[in-house]
Amino acid sequence: MSSKFIIDSMLPKYHQQFHHQQLFQSATTEAPAAYSSSSPSGSSPQHSSSSASTSPAARMYPYVSAAHHHHQAAAAAFGAAASGSMVPSFSSTASSALAAAVDAATDKSCRYTAGLAANVTPADSMVNYTLGQHHHNGAAVSAASSVSAASASMAVAAQFYHQAASAVVDPLNSCSQPAAPGGQPIPDIPRYPWMSITDWMSPFDRVVCGPNGCPRRRGRQTYTRFQTLELEKEFHFNHYLTRRRRIEIAHALCLTERQIKIWFQNRRMKLKKELRAVKEINEQARREREEQERHKQQQQEKQQKIEQQTHSSIHQHHHDPMKMSLDKSGGSDLLKAVSKVPT
């Protein structure tokens, strides 16, 4: 929930009634002030005569009272247009003031640009916003000039955000490129597809809220090929850096010490994972090799058993005919001996 909604809920009810009463009073009191502000002394928003009529509620709640200020500006412009018969040369200026008031009422995206155009700190932009609205009520000429100043300040702010985003996304190029002589703008650095996400975003919009309302972590740091190559070279010789060496590398690569330290931590963790993966692969290969050797040994044992069985069967068949021949010869000798027995 933004601060604007909190202020809307805290705003007292009599504040709107007070401004509705002032709406009809300003139609008669702001017209002479518009004529008196045509002098050089009344053209500045800080010394405008209408700034004295700022209500305390408008000082406390400048965002909520903006709509009432726009109504006051429209009423003042109508009053000036009605009295155009007294000063004929001011009628065209009053119509331009009316158009500027309507444009300011419809376009609320320039509420912070008045402070940037006047080289004022962002803390005073809230006060300058209320003074700018009273300046629309009091001075018609400065109203048209403030619209052009607001558009110019928007361009300046966009260029500032573009340079800030470029410096954050690519610190190497922002560090290595010196300022151009003669006050000329530095040429744009090459933009890559992954850098265009935060190109035209303000620093406040770059904070992304998560689903539970908490801000998410910042995006990962992108390193160039040169930076990655130098870091890999250093990691090849030293897995751990000393403080002095870390400072030297950070200065040489236009990075911070924290980025160097985090990169080396991640690289050591990556090496540890790679070694663990290689160890697991070697262990799996060793198991497969042992399994193959065991299977081969079992096959050899089976083959040896089969060979032994075949050899024993062949040897047994070779001894059986010899035994049968011996039995036959023994039987014939026994018959001969029996036949020779005397009677």
From Swiss-Prot:
The keyword tRNA-binding does not apply. GO terms for molecular function: DNA binding; DNA-binding transcription factor activity, RNA polymerase II-specific. SMART domains: HOX. Residues 29-54, 286-343 are annotated as: Disordered. Pfam families: Abdominal-A, Homeodomain. Residues 216-275 bind DNA. Residues 286-305 have a biased composition (Basic and acidic residues). SUPFAM superfamilies: Homeodomain-like (SSF46689). Keywords: Developmental protein, DNA-binding, Homeobox, Nucleus. Its main location: nucleus. One of its GO terms (cellular component) is nucleus. Sequence-specific transcription factor which is part of a developmental regulatory system that provides cells with specific positional identities on the anterior-posterior axis. This is Homeobox protein abdominal-A homolog. It comes from Tribolium castaneum.
